[in-house]
């Protein structure tokens, strides 16, 4: 039954005043036992669930977003037709019109909504929502007011209006709905404030978000307290005027202007047809509810808090069955949003004072960007062309994107962000069209900044391009950047690019006139890290002093800005866990006042958070200290001079006019603690430690071995100060001409290694530590000063060193008092350090062989162990190291 017929039957029933009360009373008596459940069934209350992913392929994707999924039985019981519009009403009063679509096997009593639909209506899976067919007419919307954010106020409203009317033609809108459209490659979200129909009726604006949220919270709280209260009883306590004729609950709630009457009944469009006898049932519901309202009002004079809430949220609206849709002739008016939202947005804007450690880069960027945008006439008067582009390059996490956002916020320019891979399309010409749209919009809304992130993915070198799409994209971007200066907005549009692979960019893009300036955003040093930490901890409660902050900045080698931010977050979690561990039942308000970050929290967090550049090559630094190595005090001193002194006392080296040693080579017989010394150095220095085994770099493919060497040094520079440890260097740096392998792989690797250690590009804050037991096989070019400055011979341990080794071993072993340490030292004259440890281990095993419950290691066990473990370094090899030391002139310690 159409809306007109429903009105006609209602009028006929109203004229028969004598029959109305009787019908109402009979209806009320018949429904009294189960009024709440019947009302919920007829109102179409369903449970929200997620939209099914597998939908009919015949349905266009653009149309699938406007569908809701229902079961066939649910649609039949609710009188919902296939493909017809339905009204969704949530508990908080938000309404939206969608199209019903049946799904085979869909569970009954549920409605499938997309994530966007759930967000628009304000529901989540499991919530209750009312689904009703549109019983009435749909008119053309003559006028519509939409809210536009303040940053979009300068857009061409005429073009945006055309885009909205073209893409949303036929969509039924209500006040408070959100409209989504893509304009010049950028998504827009507009809120409908007011709708005026062709009949002259005006649907007013919705309540503010804060009011709606407050009402929703109050409603949820009241519903929890009165969950047993039936819906019919709640509705019966609403205060309605006697002169109003209530319509069916299945019609939507929309605010209307009572002064405006229907003037366009000739263009009404019937949306659904009710069943033949459905109007009679509707009349019974109306009269029954009318009687319930009147009887309840007589017996309940005072309203509870829940009743006043219901009266406020529902009684303030009227019922109407007229809806309005967008057409090509609808007039769209754009209004600015509330200024309160602006103030909230300003709190999260990135500014210059929030960026630490990049003062010199920020100064250069501001000179290039701010002057042309703020004072374009100055450049014109001197005839200086304004820069068109600035390229920021550096490792990930150093702050390139953050700088772009800060510049846009400080200058007040419009920002368009292009993420390289996002605009790439498989369709011919679509990627170039998106680029043209973005540049056209930026030109229209000048001053503007176009920020292209991951520029290397969008514009790689055309020589190595795999397909024609990449070449066309590069050509389009070159043309668009050349066209910036010829536009009316000369100097008002600037392209800001960011990449961590500048060598992969096309050469034509990096020439002056396109990207006029290239600024490196590198890994911060200790002073920069201190500045970053101070900025990050400015609003964080902590107990760190200036000295502790300086210590933390000095120890955070290789950490970039993003790593330090994650480090602060992890330290905060450590502090929170520390407080909750002591007082687990503390309320949240008191916990917030007690949580203060300390240096211990930061040190604990540094064990879990490693520099991002070290994650792919991170190794577990062994827990070996200098005290675990017996003797060798002079070697420890030499290593401290080469590694720790340049970091702790840089002014001393500057005062003396010398450079710290670049490389240290440890050579000597096997088992003399060369690798163990490297482990202790990695642990004691606290530097980033890269352990490289010589054979690991060798690869059977041409060029891969050299690339592995380059990558190793590149990573070391990225996390400087750092140590590269080459174990078994003789396998990697063999003397040139001695390699018999095909293609002279060893020679090429050696050449790459020599270039990296002392080539045109200076190796700064990276120390080379190598170990070998065959120094005669290493190429002489690698052994010269400037590459390997310190060559240290690690001989067999002398008597004093053997005493220290035995003491370290006896410290953790139950040794009997009859064991004579001096005698053991004399008996192990030609033993290496590893062999002495083997003697102690063998003695302990012999004691366990005699008695598995043994508590002491006796002298006889050591005597038997010495006969089992004999020196494995022959006299000839010892003589070889001594002769090599004398002939080569290498100094010993």
From Swiss-Prot:
Matching CDD domains: RecA-like_CDC48_NLV2_r1-like, RecA-like_CDC48_r2-like
Binding site for ATP 1: 394-401
Keywords: ATP-binding, Chaperone, Cytoplasm, Cytoskeleton, Deafness, Developmental protein, Differentiation, Disease variant, Epilepsy, Hydrolase, Intellectual disability, Isopeptide bond, Mitochondrion, Nucleotide-binding, Phosphoprotein, Repeat, Ribosome biogenesis, Spermatogenesis, Ubl conjugation
MF-aspect GO terms: ATP binding; ATP hydrolysis activity; preribosome binding
EC number: 3.6.4.10
Phosphothreonine modified-residue sites: 272
Disease connection: Neurodevelopmental disorder with hearing loss, seizures, and brain abnormalities: An autosomal recessive disorder characterized by intellectual disability, intractable epilepsy, microcephaly, abnormal muscle tone, and sensorineural hearing loss.
Quaternary assembly: Part of the 55LCC heterohexameric ATPase complex composed at least of AIRIM, AFG2A, AFG2B and CINP. Associates with pre-60S ribosomal particles.
Name this polypeptide is given: ATPase family gene 2 protein homolog A
Organism listed in the record: Homo sapiens (Human)
Gene: AFG2A
């Amino acid at each position: 039954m159409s809306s007109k017929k429903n009105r006609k039957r209602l009028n006929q029933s109203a004229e028969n005043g004598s029959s109305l009360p009787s019908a109402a009373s009979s209806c009320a008596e018949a429904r009294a036992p189960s009024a709440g459940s019947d009302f919920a069934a007829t109102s179409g209350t369903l449970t929200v669930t997620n939209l099914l992913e597998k939908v009919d392929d015949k349905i266009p994707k653009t149309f699938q977003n406007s569908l809701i999924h229902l079961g066939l039985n649910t649609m039949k019981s609710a009188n919902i037709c296939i493909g017809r519009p339905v009204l969704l009403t949530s508990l908080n009063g938000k309404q939206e019109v969608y199209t019903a679509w049946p799904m085979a096997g869909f569970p009954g009593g549920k409605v499938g909504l997309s994530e966007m639909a759930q967000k628009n209506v304000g529901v989540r899976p499991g919530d209750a929502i009312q689904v009703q067919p549109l019983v009435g007419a749909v008119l053309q919307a003559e006028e519509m007011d939409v809210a536009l954010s303040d940053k979009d106020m300068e857009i061409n409203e005429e073009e945006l209006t055309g885009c909205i009317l073209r893409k949303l033609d036929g969509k039924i809108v209500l006040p408070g709905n959100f409209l989504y459209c893509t304009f010049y490659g950028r998504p827009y979200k507009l809120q409908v404030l007011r709708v005026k129909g062709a009949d002259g009726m005006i649907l007013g604006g919705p309540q503010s978000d804060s009011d709606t949220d407050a009402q929703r919270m109050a409603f949820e709280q009241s519903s929890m307290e009165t969950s047993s209260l039936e819906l019919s009883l709640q509705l019966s306590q609403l205060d309605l005027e006697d002169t109003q004729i209530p319509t069916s609950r299945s019609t939507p709630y929309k605010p209307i202007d009572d002064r405006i009457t229907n003037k366009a009944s000739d263009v009404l469009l019937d949306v659904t047809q009710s069943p033949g006898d459905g109007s009679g049932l509707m009349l019974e519901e109306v009269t029954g509810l009318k009687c319930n309202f009147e009887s309840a009002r007589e017996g309940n004079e005072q309203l509870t808090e829940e009743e006043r809430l219901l009266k406020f949220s529902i009684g303030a609206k009227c019922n109407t069955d007229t809806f309005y849709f967008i057409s090509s002739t609808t007039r769209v008016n754009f209004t600015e949003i509330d200024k309160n939202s602006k103030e909230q947005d300003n709190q999260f804007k990135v500014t210059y004072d929030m960026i630490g450690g990049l003062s010199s880069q920020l100064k250069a960027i501001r000179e290039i960007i701010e002057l042309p945008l703020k004072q374009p006439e100055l450049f014109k008067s001197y005839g200086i062309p304004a820069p068109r582009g600035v390229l920021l390059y550096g490792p990930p996490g150093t702050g390139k994107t953050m700088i772009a956002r800060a510049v846009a916020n400080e200058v007040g320019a419009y920002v368009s962000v292009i993420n390289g891979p996002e605009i790439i399309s498989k369709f011919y010409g679509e990627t170039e069209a998106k680029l043209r749209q973005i540049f056209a919009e930026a030109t229209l809304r000048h001053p503007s900044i176009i920020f292209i992130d991951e520029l290397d993915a969008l514009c790689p070198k055309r020589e190595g391009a795999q397909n024609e799409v990449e070449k066309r994209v590069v050509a389009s971007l070159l043309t668009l950047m050349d066209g910036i200066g010829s536009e009316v907005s000369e100097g008002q549009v600037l392209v800001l690019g960011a990449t961590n692979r500048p060598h992969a960019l096309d050469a034509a893009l990096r020439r002056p006139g396109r990207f006029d300036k290239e600024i490196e955003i590198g890994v911060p040093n200790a002073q920069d890290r201190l500045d970053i930490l101070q900025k990050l901890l400015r609003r964080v409660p902590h107990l760190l002093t200036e000295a502790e902050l300086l210590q933390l900045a000095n120890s955070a080698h290789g950490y970039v800005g993003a790593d330090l931010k994650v480090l602060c977050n992890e330290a905060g979690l450590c502090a929170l866990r520390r407080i909750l561990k002591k007082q687990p039942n503390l309320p949240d308000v008191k916990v917030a006042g007690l949580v203060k970050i300390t240096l211990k929290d930061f040190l604990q967090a540094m064990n879990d958070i490693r520099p991002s550049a070290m994650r792919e090559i991170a190794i577990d630094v062994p827990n070996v200290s200098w005290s675990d190595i017996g003797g060798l005090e002079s070697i420890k001193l030499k290593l401290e001079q080469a590694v720790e002194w340049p970091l702790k006392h840089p002014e001393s080296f500057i005062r003396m006019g010398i450079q710290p040693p670049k490389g240290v080579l440890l050579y000597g017989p096997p088992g003399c603690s060369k690798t163990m010394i490297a482990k202790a150095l990695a642990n004691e220095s606290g530097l980033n430690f890269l352990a490289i085994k010589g054979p690991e770099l060798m690869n059977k493919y041409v060029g891969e071995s050299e690339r592995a060497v380059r990558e190793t040094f590149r990573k070391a520079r990225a996390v400087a100060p750092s140590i590269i440890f080459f174990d078994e260097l003789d396998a990697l740096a063999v003397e040139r001409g001695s390699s018999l392998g095909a293609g002279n792989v060893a020679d090429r690797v050696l050449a790459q290694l020599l270039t990296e250690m002392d080539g045109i590009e200076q190796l700064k804050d990276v120390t080379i530590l190598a170990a070998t037991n065959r120094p005669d096989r290493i190429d002489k070019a690698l052994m010269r000063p400037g590459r390997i400055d310190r060559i240290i011979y690690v001989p067999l341990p002398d008597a004093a060193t053997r005493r220290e080794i035995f003491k370290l071993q006896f410290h953790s072993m139950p040794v009997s008092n009859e064991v004579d340490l001096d005698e053991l030292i004399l008996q192990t004259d030609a033993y290496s350090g590893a062999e002495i440890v083997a003697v102690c281990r063998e003695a302990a095993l012999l004691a366990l062989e005699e008695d598995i419950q043994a508590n002491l290691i006796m002298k006889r066990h050591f005597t038997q162990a010495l006969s089992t473990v004999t020196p494995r370094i022959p006299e000839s090899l010892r003589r070889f190291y001594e002769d090599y030391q004398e002939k080569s002139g290498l100094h010993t310690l």
